[in-house]
């Protein structure tokens, strides 16, 4: 029983359901919302890591490409998106890097917030999975993250500040089934 659970928690390859979502038609993926009961259950689920073998796969490359295309599409126009928001319960996020020249979107597999500094600051947040709502959330302005480099497959640590740090915290929360509304200081 324990072995089966360990395998279930640490998949070694993409499931058929994941492949179907990743390789679905079009470059824009459907964004799950809390308005749909089934979607809401997915959004409240914890995510599994992505293995090195999976990071080398065409499915991962397609997923990364489609996540960026989805979050930047005119229908969404977001600054970040996480695996569960497109139906993939894996630890992967795409984040717009406002701390880098040109504000590029970058994809981070197996990302985790591992440290924070300073005090939290309250700021407005919204979410692609909670359309039409915004609220004030207290977040750290300085964090450290770790993620798996797709070039070396080693854990990489990065220190991030400002609005980009807020985006990472929001997206990493999604990977643990947490929505920004769980922290709300005021919903409009």
Q: Where does each model-flagged region fall?
A:
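Bacterial N-terminal signal peptides
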Residues: 1-6
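Positively charged
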Residues: 8-188
